[in-house]
Amino acid sequence: MGYLKKVGMCISLLIVIIFVTSCGGGNKITGDSKETQIKKSFAKTLDMYPIKNLDDLYDKEGYRDGEFKKGDKGTWGISSAMVKQPKGKIMRSRGMYLFLNRNTRTAKGYFIVDVTSNDTLKKTEDKEKRYPVKMVNNKIIPIGPINDEGIKKEIENFKFFSQYGDFKGLKNYQNGDYSYNSEAPTYSAKFQLSNDDYNVKQLRKMYDIQTKKAPKLLLKCTGDLKGSSIGHKDIEFTFVENQEENVFFTDSLEFTPSEDY
């Protein structure tokens, strides 16, 4: 009788342990490993790269949830920006944001030039200038006259990273640093790349990147790991990051309700 009682107590204790374990792991992902699930989530977007013809996005469906109104086909938002701050100098960034409305099959956005100076005796000064643009037949065109021929040419020749980047080998990236916060929710993956990496070579071709340091790649997302139209995913290639010098590149591709833009 005593033996049966002990067995019953052990079974009860085991049930309690299983219950507590299953309910208490706030940042624990069941099923596939955390790394695998995070990679799969980013792959849903990054597998689309490269999108050589941005007009293809008009016929490309993205993740939909209850945030979309009935009949709304959604809008693709894409952006790419290069940020440089040589040692002892001001920070300059140049990039473009474009929003492709699948309902109207039109795309508008802006090219941005930003200069940020930090004087220890004054407040940080941020000077930003936006140039409205539109896209017609996969070509970026300024809206309105631009006196600066250099800026005009830069706009017309601009390429988003999503047009030439390639993440088909993402699943093979090794030694990643993964984080997941189910309460925020946010998740990310960081990798140390080499200068032989395809995407790093492409960035060096597109931009005058002086440093020879290989960048770190950060994939980060705000939103549910299972998918959400509220959150957004960002890509960052950080070549140099400290108080005196910064060189990094950012990129984003997201699908949202059209009323957000």
Swiss-Prot record:
Lipid group attachment sites (S-diacylglycerol cysteine): C23
Record-given protein name: Uncharacterized lipoprotein SAB0392
UniProtKB keywords: Cell membrane, Lipoprotein, Membrane, Palmitate, Signal
Cell compartments where the protein resides: Cell membrane
Lipid-binding residues (covalent, N-palmitoyl cysteine): C23
Pfam families for this protein: DUF576
Recorded family membership: Belongs to the staphylococcal tandem lipoprotein family.
Any one GO CC term of the record: plasma membrane
UniProt signal peptide: 1-22
Main location: membrane
Signal is among the record's keywords: yes
Presence of keyword Signal: yes
Membrane topology listed for this record: Lipid-anchor
